[in-house]
């Protein structure tokens, strides 16, 4: 299942951090492909879905636009194709999870040391010290242990996406750096309805329920039935 979530975050919490504006979240999701054949001018199914939802929400008319996702290349391919002027941000907690997993691989017998090492990397990440962070990872790439592969993957993941990890600058700009709203949408719109005990779904059936859930959670349920009624009368 692929999910597109749109929200605004002009509100601030007590510490001045951006929080989503109440009632601003909308969802659109389905089991469909995000892949586009090489040299094809036809957008993928999911790209078209994203374009419909962003058009509906007038995303491109906003003063500032941001695309938040994990490090998956297909997300950034869609973002670059559809919204070349949007700021791209890798979810900060995804990056920290990668660093935490690496810390455990580097110090499997010493959880306290792993936690300390990870926290030092977190601080470098949050403070915008990406060069220092990459420098701290580099020596472990040359080791002969199994953790060298993990270190190499983490290093290249951060290096490849470093322009999307300028979290100090993003915070100064008042931008969200977490995709928590998207993660919550995956749970509320998808998992709690489709992943109950004993359930089995066809793609057609699951997509129908997903569409219905997204309509309800996006506050478009009544609009959906009104449009359906108009189409039936026109037919």
Residue map of PLM features:
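Catalytic center-proximal scaffold of phosphoryl-transfer enzymes
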Residues: 1-235
């Amino acid at each position: 299942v692929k999910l597109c979530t749109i929200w605004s975050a002009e509100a601030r919490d007590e510490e001045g951090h951006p929080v989503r504006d109440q009632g601003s979240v909308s969802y659109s999701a389905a089991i469909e492909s995000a892949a586009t054949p090489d040299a094809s001018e036809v957008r993928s199914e999911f790209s078209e879905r994203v374009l419909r939802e962003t058009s509906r929400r007038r995303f491109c008319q906003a003063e500032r636009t941001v695309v938040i996702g994990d490090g998956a290349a297909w997300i950034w391919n869609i973002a670059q194709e559809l919204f070349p002027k949007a700021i791209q941000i890798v979810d900060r907690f995804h990056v920290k999870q990668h660093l935490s997993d690496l810390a455990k691989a580097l110090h499997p017998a010493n959880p306290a040391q792993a936690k300390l090492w990870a926290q030092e990397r977190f601080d470098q990440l949050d403070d915008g010290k990406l060069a220092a962070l990459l420098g701290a990872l580099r020596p472990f790439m040359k080791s002969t242990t199994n953790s060298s592969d993990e270190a190499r993957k983490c290093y290249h993941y951060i290096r490849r996406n470093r322009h999307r990890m300028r979290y100090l600058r993003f915070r100064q700009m008042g931008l969200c750096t977490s995709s928590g709203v998207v993660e919550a949408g995956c749970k509320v719109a998808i998992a709690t309805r489709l992943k109950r005990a004993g359930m089995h779904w066809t793609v057609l059936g699951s997509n129908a329920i997903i569409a219905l859930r997204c309509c309800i959670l996006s506050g478009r349920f009544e609009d959906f039935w009104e449009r359906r009624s108009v189409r039936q009368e026109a037919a």
